Every structure is written in C-alpha cells, then in structure tokens.
Amino acid sequence: MNPVRTLSATKAAFFSAYPRPINAVYRRVVEELLVELHLTTVNSTFVYDPFFALGLVTLYDGLMEAYHPPEQREAIFNALCKALHLKPEVLRKNARDLLELMGSGDPRQRLDLLCLKPEAEDVGGLKAILERMTQPPYAYSRVLAVGLYTAYEVVAKSLYEEPEERTRRFLENVVSKLPFSTERVRKDLELYRSSLDRMKQARAVVEEMVKAARRQQERRQSAASLPETSLGDPSKPGS
C-alpha cells in the first residue's frame, strides 16, 4: 500500500517544478489552490472524472486570467498538476471534451442527463459517471462543484436568462440528486464567484500601479531629453 503523500511533499514538488517567483497578488491564490487540491486528491474516496477536470481548469483559468507574463500561466498550471500526480494535458482535454459534449445536441436533453432523468439520452458515458456520484462514499470538493455547474451552465444559459435562476435550478434539479449538501454547494459557488471578483479588483489596482509607474518613467525620460539651457558667462559683456 502506497503511503499518502504529505502536503509538504506536494508543495516541494510544485516549487521544484516551478522554481520561478510568482507575482505577489497570485502567489496566495496558487498556494491556496494547491492545498485545496492536495486535500481533495489524497482523500481515499476521491475519484477523477471529467467534471473534476473541468472544475480545476475553470477555477485556475478564471483566477489566473490576467497573470503576467501570460506565457507563464500554463507553466504554473503544469507544475500544479504534476505536484498532484495529475497530467495537465489530459485534464485540459477532458475539460474541452466535456464542454463540447454539453454544447452539442438538444440543450434540454443535456439538461435531463445532468438531472439524471431516466429517459435522458446518454452521451460520452456521462450517465455512468453521474450515477457513480450518487453512490457514497464519493469525495465532494469545491472543484467538483464548479465543474458540475460549468457543464450545467453551458446548456442552462440558453434556457434561463438570469444567473440567480440558473443557480437555483442547478441546486434543485442537479445537486439534489447527488449525496452532496445543496447548502455547501451554494456556498462554494458563491466563494468561487467572490474570489473572481476579488481578483478583478486586485488586477485593476495592479494595472493602475503599472500605468502610474509607466507615466512617471515617461516624464523622467522627457525631462532627461530636454536640451540644457545655457545662461552664458556673466563675466563677459553681453552675457
């Protein structure tokens, strides 16, 4: 039996895979996500599925959307996955495939599938995955909740205009069929949205600081490029 890896080992693996410094605004985000994912994946009842993959990709991409330099976003994601013994390319492919499945065909049929209605048409083996979730023990996580809601929203957007109604119907019709607390799912979705809002505010502050620094640098460069004014030699006539 393999020993459960420790949080310190997971952190060490991450920083070994990505030794570069992470921008201060995002370092806490990455570390908190790493801890959350570690605790989820070492749970003995954790099951990897496309909904978890979609949740992880959605969470990460949403929180790290404005990270600079942009080319480092994927490098950090890859290091995060590898530290958790997950394959980043598989995660992204599973997430894309799930979004494509939910976006194809009749929206109401896809919605019926998520609601586990007996007459719902199965696509991509999703019915078996969802039915597996109904059989406890099944590790619940915020990442899984975000994945389920993201898949649901693909079809629900065309049926229900208001976000509040979409969330309410998701809790009533999808989560209620699963052995998860609807209240906990609701709070986790609220936490996710508030985290996105905080990151947007933080980005706005950082962007303003960058603009201010750039303006100050431009003023200095302009001042340095001005020709020196000669006042002449006061000891000479006409000076």
From Swiss-Prot:
Spans annotated as Disordered: 211-239
The entry's keywords: Coiled coil
A GO CC annotation given for this chain: plasma membrane-derived thylakoid photosystem II
InterPro entries for the chain: Thf1 (IPR017499)
Coiled coil: 183-221
GO BP of this protein: photosystem II assembly
Composition bias, Basic and acidic residues: 211-221
Function, as annotated: May be involved in photosynthetic membrane biogenesis.
Family the entry assigns: Belongs to the THF1 family.
Name used for this protein in its record: Protein Thf1
Species name: Synechococcus sp. (strain JA-2-3B'a(2-13)) (Cyanobacteria bacterium Yellowstone B-Prime)
Taxonomy of the source species: Bacteria, Bacillati, Cyanobacteriota, Cyanophyceae, Synechococcales
